[in-house]
Each structure stands twice: as structure tokens, then as C-alpha cells.
């Protein structure tokens, strides 16, 4: 009897200690923002450099394939598979971001990140060594799985390695890296394809990915490893399986519809209607599941409904949408209207890249100094909207100085927007919930970016078909325009109509940029709704809360120890 009672009390002590650990840090991420516990100097510099290299590779992989695709299709003789080369990566990347956001809250942070890097490396190796088109597509899908974990993992590592008051500067670098890689990707893809082989677009990931893995393995230290102290049965329950069953196929179905619609199949095709319907139904089901089971939800309702998280989601979704439209269709303007090659059009985006980098760094430094990120977000969204509006002024006779100026204004605005939603998530949420918040922000950017590439392309095709229909002796469908490509359209028209087609193409592109302008203006509403919270004040609150938790934990431990000692003394 004495032994049984003693066992029960020890078990109660262990259970209470488990609860205290969970409350004080959840996933073991909480250091109380005592800056002495974070890495410093060379160790921090090497860790963050390598982590950002990983982010650069993931973002690079989205667009590096754009200029390599012709060489890949020529080698595999699989022209019907072209759409899958980009879609396979996008589907798995977008579908797993929220999943990894949940995993980082209760699994070992280092092990989870390294697993994502391994998936990305395996996928890259399969792509580089692919003997046929099917193997290449499988490799792209595997790489996309890892990419979702790396993207979210970089933000989690920033939380683990850097105190809150200093994170904005690194978040600024995060935005700069993402923006630079989005533009440099096609340039590197073209360079590798022309001078070495398209396979090096993917082999290049292997040594750099290995460097990232080594740096994280040896330099990243997370209290308790970041893993929730609970059984695997409890961890599986925390995974919200029923929610994932709705989320993953829902996102995949929606992305498939958007990738195929208007390109591979018409929007009225049964496949597109089925994918759209299935995707929307499953995503609605996912939302209901989150409300129904909030304790194990992938995205707990109390997180999404928090004011800064909701407005951050709004800003990120619309930001991802309008920046994708501008980045995707501005090179088309250079190629179709100015006669640039694909590589030249990429080079002409360098003013945009430089503006993003400078603005991101300045915004990060400014936020670190003042403690407030909301004013920079408001200024950034307004400036980006002005820049998006300037693209409506583009004409065939637009001078070099003008289009450079338009890019600088727009890029400077974007640089001021990138970091605020993520910093807000890390500021208003506890450290164990921050991965879910940042994953939600990334998911919004990725999903809406994918949606509005398709929207923009369909606007361009429809507008161009309408404007060309008015030309005497010339009739063309949106499908024929899409098949002809950027410059192929001019080869389909009589020489005497080239100038008219040029102005029609320019007008259609301006209508597409108008979509970007509308989205950029709507982004301002989200920035105005963002809470004014200081990272400096929140860090102080976290330090005080961490101290209180430590005192409560010590008191609870002492209380149970006293209870056990008392029972022993009385022979219970």
C-alpha cells in the first residue's frame, strides 16, 4: 500500500512538471529573452549566414527552372509535362508550410529542420540525376516538401537564436534574401543551362545544403531541443490528423486548378471545376475542424483571430499576390515591348532587387532602434501601392530612367513590408505559438502568390485577345496567345500589324498591372489595422513572465517534494 501511494505521488509530480514545462515554453523555445543565453559573435554570424543560404536556395528553386525548362523538355522529349515542372514543387511546398508550422511547436527544432534539409537535398539530387521526365517531377515534389520545412524553420531558428528586440534586423535580411533570389533565379538558371548544364540548377543545392545542415547541427542550441515533453501518442494527437486530411488535398486541388486553368484546360473543363470545388470544400472543412477542435488545431482559432495575426495574414496574402504579378509580368513587358532576351529582362530587374535589399535592411535597423514595426509597414504598403501605380504608365517609348525609377519606388515599398507580419507574429504570440503564426504568414504569401499568377495570366490573355480582335484581318483566341508565348505572337501577325500588336500587348499588360495596383491598395487596409506593439517592451514582458514561471515551477517542485518527505516521515 505504501509503495502504491508513493508511486502515485511521484507520477503526479512528473505530470505537474510536464505541465509546467509546457506552459513555460511549449516547444522548448523560451529562453526568457535573457540575451546572455543566445549565441553571439562569430558563432551567430556563421549560423545565420548558413540559415539564410538555405532560405536563398529554397526561394531560388521556385524560379530557377523558368529559363532551364526549354533545355529540359528538349532532352526528355516530354513537352506535355512542362506544367508539372513548376507545379510539383509549388504543390508540396504550399501544402506543407502549415504542417511544418505545427511540427515545430512540439518536435525537436534541430531534427525537424535537418529533416527538411534532407528532403530538399534528396529532391535536388533526384532532379539533377533524373533519367526521364517522371523522375524529374518526383524530384521536384520531394524538394518542395523540404522547402516548406526550411522556410518555416528559418523563422523558428531566428526565434531560437536571436532575442526579440534584435529580430527585426534579421527579419529584414529574410525579406531581402527572398526578394533577391526571386529575381536572380532565372538569371542563374539561364547561366547554368547555357554554360554548363541545366542539371547544375539542382546539383548546386547539394554542397550549399550540406553546409547549412552542418552549421545548424553544430551551432544551433535550443533549450530542451525544442521538443515537447510528452508521449508520441500525445504528439500524434497534437498533429490534428483530421485537419491535415482536409488541408493537404484541399490546397493541392486548389493549386492544380489554378495551374491548369486557362493553360492546360479551359476554365469550363470538368477537371478544373472538379479541382476548384473539391479544393474549396476541403478548405472549408479544414476551417470547421479548427473551430471544432481548437486545442489540437493546426491553426488554433485564437491565433488566427488575434488582431495582429489576422491583419498580418491579410497583408502577406495581398503582398504575395501583387508582388508576384509585378515580378512575373514585368520581365514579359521587357521581352515583348522592349525586345529583351530572357536574360536581359532579368538583368533589367536589378534596380528592383537593389531597392528591396536597401529598404529591407533600413527597415530592420529602424525597427530595432525604435522598437515599432507598424509605422514602417504603413509607409511600405503606401509606397508599394504608389510604385504599382507607376507601372500603369509604361509605354513602348518609356525611357530607361523612367522604368528604373518605377522599380526603385516599388521595390523600396516592398522592402518595408516584408518583415512586419513575421515580427508581429513573434511579438504578440508566445514562443511556443510563434511557429504557427509565422507559418500562417508564409502560407498566405505562397498560396495567394500562386493564385494571382494564374489570375494575372488570364487577365493578360483575355485582354490581349479582345484588343487583337479589333484589328482588321486578324483573329486569335486566348489559348493561341498562351501557346505562342511572349515573342511568338509577333511571328503570327502580318508585318504591317506589328506596331498595332505592340501597343495592344502593352495595353493588355497595363491592365494586368492594374490588378497588382488594386491588390497593393488593399494591402494598406491591413497595415492600418496592425497593432502598435513594441518589440522592446514585449521582450521585457517576456523576461518578467519567464521569471515568474521559473519561480512557480520551483515552488511547485518544492511543494511536491515536501509532500513526499512528509509522507515518508509518517510512514504513509
From Swiss-Prot:
Q: What does this protein do?
A: MFS-type transporter; part of the gene cluster that mediates the biosynthesis of an emodin derivative that may be involved in black Sigatoka disease of banana.
Instruction: Cite the entry's keywords alphabetically.
Output: Membrane, Transmembrane, Transmembrane helix
CDD domains in alphabetical order: MFS_Azr1_MDR_like
State the annotated membrane topology for this chain.
Answer: Multi-pass membrane protein
- Sequence ranges of Basic and acidic residues compositional bias: 539-556
Q: Which family does it belong to?
A: Belongs to the major facilitator superfamily. TCR/Tet family.
Please verify whether the record's keywords include rRNA-binding.
no
Q: Which Gene3D superfamilies match?
A: MFS general substrate transporter like domains
Q: Where in the cell is it found?
A: Membrane
User: Which Gene Ontology terms of cellular component type are present?
Assistant: plasma membrane
Pfam families recorded for this chain? MFS_1
Q: Which GO terms describe its molecular function?
A: transmembrane transporter activity
How is this protein named in the record?
A: MFS-type transporter MYCFIDRAFT_190113
* Span list, region Disordered: 539-572
- Main localization is membrane
Mind telling me which residue stretches traverse the membrane in this protein?
45-65, 81-101, 117-137, 142-162, 172-192, 200-220, 243-263, 272-292, 313-333, 346-366, 374-394, 403-423, 436-456, 512-532
InterPro entries documented for this protein: MFS, MFS_dom, MFS_trans_sf
Amino acid at each position: 500500500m505504501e509503495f502504491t501511494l508513493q508511486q502515485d505521488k511521484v507520477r503526479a509530480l512528473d505530470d505537474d512538471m510536464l505541465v509546467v514545462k509546457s506552459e513555460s515554453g511549449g516547444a522548448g523555445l523560451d529562453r526568457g529573452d535573457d540575451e546572455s543565453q543566445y549565441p553571439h559573435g562569430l558563432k551567430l554570424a556563421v549560423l545565420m549566414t548558413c540559415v539564410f543560404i538555405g532560405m536563398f536556395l529554397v526561394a531560388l528553386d521556385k524560379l530557377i527552372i523558368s529559363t532551364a525548362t526549354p533545355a529540359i523538355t528538349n532532352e526528355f522529349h516530354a513537352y506535355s509535362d512542362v506544367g508539372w515542372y513548376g507545379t510539383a514543387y509549388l504543390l508540396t511546398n504550399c501544402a506543407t508550410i502549415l504542417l511544418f508550422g505545427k511540427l515545430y511547436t512540439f518536435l525537436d527544432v534541430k531534427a525537424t529542420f535537418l529533416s527538411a534539409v534532407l528532403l530538399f537535398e534528396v529532391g535536388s539530387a533526384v532532379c539533377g540525376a533524373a533519367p526521364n521526365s517522371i523522375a524529374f517531377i518526383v524530384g521536384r515534389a520531394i524538394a518542395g516538401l523540404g522547402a516548406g520545412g526550411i522556410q518555416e524553420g528559418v523563422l523558428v531558428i531566428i526565434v531560437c537564436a536571436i532575442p526579440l528586440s534584435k529580430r527585426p534586423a534579421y527579419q529584414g535580411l529574410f525579406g531581402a534574401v527572398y526578394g533577391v533570389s526571386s529575381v536572380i533565379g532565372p538569371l542563374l538558371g539561364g547561366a547554368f543551362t547555357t554554360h554548363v548544364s541545366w542539371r547544375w540548377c539542382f546539383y548546386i543545392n547539394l554542397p550549399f545544403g550540406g553546409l547549412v545542415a552542418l552549421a545548424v547541427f553544430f551551432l544551433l542550441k535550443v533549450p530542451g531541443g525544442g521538443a515537447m515533453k510528452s508521449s508520441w501518442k500525445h504528439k500524434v494527437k497534437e498533429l490534428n490528423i483530421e485537419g491535415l486530411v482536409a488541408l493537404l488535398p484541399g490546397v493541392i486541388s486548389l493549386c492544380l486548378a489554378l495551374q491548369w486553368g486557362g493553360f492546360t484546360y479551359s476554365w469550363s473543363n470538368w477537371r478544373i471545376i472538379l479541382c476548384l470545388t473539391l479544393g474549396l470544400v476541403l478548405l472549408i472543412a479544414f476551417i470547421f475542424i479548427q473551430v471544432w477542435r481548437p486545442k489540437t488545431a493546426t491553426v488554433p482559432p485564437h491565433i488566427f483571430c488575434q488582431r495582429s495575426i489576422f491583419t498580418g495574414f491579410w497583408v502577406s496574402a495581398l503582398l504575395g499576390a501583387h508582388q508576384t504579378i509585378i515580378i512575373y509580368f514585368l520581365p514579359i513587358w521587357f521581352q515583348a515591348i522592349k525586345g529583351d532576351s530572357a536574360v536581359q529582362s532579368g538583368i533589367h530587374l536589378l534596380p528592383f532587387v537593389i531597392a528591396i535589399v536597401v529598404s529591407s535592411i533600413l527597415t530592420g535597423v529602424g525597427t530595432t532602434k525604435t522598437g515599432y514595426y507598424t509605422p514602417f509597414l504603413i509607409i511600405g504598403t503606401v509606397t508599394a501601392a504608389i510604385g504599382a501605380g507607376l507601372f500603369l504608365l509604361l509605354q513602348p517609348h518609356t525611357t530607361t530612367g523612367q522604368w528604373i525609377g518605377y522599380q526603385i519606388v516599388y521595390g523600396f515599398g516592398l522592402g518595408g513590408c516584408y518583415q512586419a507580419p513575421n515580427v508581429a507574429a513573434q511579438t504578440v504570440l508566445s514562443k511556443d505559438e510563434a511557429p504557427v503564426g509565422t507559418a500562417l504568414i508564409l502560407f498566405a504569401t505562397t498560396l495567394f502568390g500562386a493564385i494571382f499568377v494564374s489570375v494575372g495570366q488570364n487577365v493578360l490573355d483575355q485582354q490581349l485577345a479582345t484588343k487583337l480582335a479589333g484589328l482588321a484581318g486578324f483573329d486569335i483566341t486566348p489559348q493561341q496567345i498562351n501557346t505562342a508565348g511572349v515573342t511568338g505572337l509577333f511571328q503570327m501577325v502580318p508585318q504591317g500589324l506589328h506596331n498595332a500588336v505592340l501597343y495592344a500587348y502593352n495595353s493588355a499588360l497595363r491592365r494586368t498591372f492594374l490588378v497588382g495596383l488594386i491588390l497593393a491598395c488593399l494591402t494598406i487596409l491591413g497595415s492600418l489595422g496592425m497593432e502598435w506593439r513594441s518589440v522592446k517592451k514585449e521582450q521585457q514582458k517576456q523576461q518578467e513572465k519567464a521569471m515568474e514561471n521559473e519561480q512557480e515551477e520551483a515552488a511547485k517542485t518544492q511543494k511536491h517534494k515536501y509532500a513526499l518527505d512528509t509522507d515518508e516521515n509518517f510512514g504513509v
